């Protein structure tokens, strides 16, 4: 048996570095967090070759006393905690004292630091060994340079990606830190090229504009909610501004960026059916709570935490997101979706746009902005822009009221005596519809015509609307089924021929565990043998001829989501049924049916999106139409024409 011995300090530091320092972005994160803990109001980050050759962090924080600099490079040396009790109420970003010795063990590190009234100190480590140390002149703060990262651990270099990928990792973490601390001015350069800069004035909206582009920042709304334990404050995107994955959700706990799937999911759940399938919101949410409720000592990078009363927090987040989006106008501007626009702005506006057009790491498109050579701010030039053009906030048609109708009685009061527009649905399948005197929050539309049996055209005082007839009736159906499924009744339709369902042993066990969930929607499965179930009757709202398919889909929801709850199951079932019963594409409606559909969708609680999040209608304003047909004249051109006349 090999002899047990104690590892050398340098080797121990290199092992620790394997957990703390995975790539250049890890070094940037640890050093910038140290700068923030030191009370810095300005942090400059300079890179060469995406940090592999050099990382330099300059801050104006409190600095380190000259006689404590060498101690700072020892393992588990820190000024941030001193007792066991401090570990359970950490109020700083760092606290373990591992970052500096870990980085120094696998790189060439030089630090210059000074406090307000003390002498400066310069120290140099390479591969964990002290190379030089002495007094030096320095302003208050810390200037630390890391070179030749992983020079003595070449195996680590093999796992690094391209320079561009490593740079994107760095800009990603810097952007998230900038969102966490808008009061800190942060700049980032790579190979002397500036990638981002924040003003440090505390305005998070300006930081959002720097990262996502000014125009996209306009599509984010403020959300704030609190209870006795938590305060949440941040910005979430409108459903029209989404991304293909959830990595654009930034969750902060007491200013610390964390990764938490459940919190991200709570944000998404708050959108309900407003998001398209496969699309995710952009969000920045800062959760403030007593540090004693958060355990940050569970992961080497401190990006995973444990939160007490987590379910209460998740419910609070979903509620806040839902309430904030509830009264917003969600009709997308059709012209706004065009990739490029030719617009006329003043020189001063162009300069503002150029300042905003600083590239971020979240895959933002680069826009071309031409700055004219003129001192006259009133001279107008044409400029090509897209996502970063600052437009006014969209006009909210009206605030939504009476968001929920919890009973079928309310639904029937809302829709009485009007026929549902769908001649593919059997008579009596849906309740009759009736107009309700309610606060106007949807444009008054006048039907014009139909295209390809798919889209309806209508006009209003503010322009042209194009309606997706399938999405519109999906929304109407969804709100009906949501009420029906939520009000489980004893009314069941007996099957002439029972449905037999065979499953694997694993699936059968899971189905039995979720019996109450299935029964919450009126679906009763009886055991019929080892792994077989029988269905003898079904809810009356099942579509005729699709009973077996509907049962199988409902069971699949339970099998595919181990955390399926009654509420989620009812929601999924309502969405499924709404799609099955909706008008399909290439189905031509006559004029009375089309007009009825427009009346019905206007009375929906959310007339703007189908249950899958797709828009029900898009809007071309009168101004948009006049621009497209060149009916709006350049004022300078008009003056010339008048002079010629």
From Swiss-Prot:
InterPro entries: DNA_mismatch_repair_CS, DNA_mismatch_repair_MutL, DNA_mismatch_S5_2-like, HATPase_C_sf, MutL/Mlh/PMS, MutL/Mlh/Pms-like, MutL_C, MutL_C_dimsub. Coiled coil: none annotated. One of its GO terms (biological process) is mismatch repair. One of its GO terms (cellular component) is mismatch repair complex. It holds the Pfam family MutL_C. It comes from the Bacteria. SUPFAM superfamilies: ATPase domain of HSP90 chaperone/DNA topoisomerase II/histidine kinase (SSF55874), DNA mismatch repair protein MutL (SSF118116), Ribosomal protein S5 domain 2-like (SSF54211). Keywords: DNA damage, DNA repair. One of its GO terms (molecular function) is ATP binding. Belongs to the DNA mismatch repair MutL/HexB family. This protein is involved in the repair of mismatches in DNA. It is required for dam-dependent methyl-directed DNA mismatch repair. May act as a 'molecular matchmaker', a protein that promotes the formation of a stable complex between two or more DNA-binding proteins in an ATP-dependent manner without itself being part of a final effector complex. This is DNA mismatch repair protein MutL. It comes from Pediococcus pentosaceus (strain ATCC 25745 / CCUG 21536 / LMG 10740 / 183-1w).
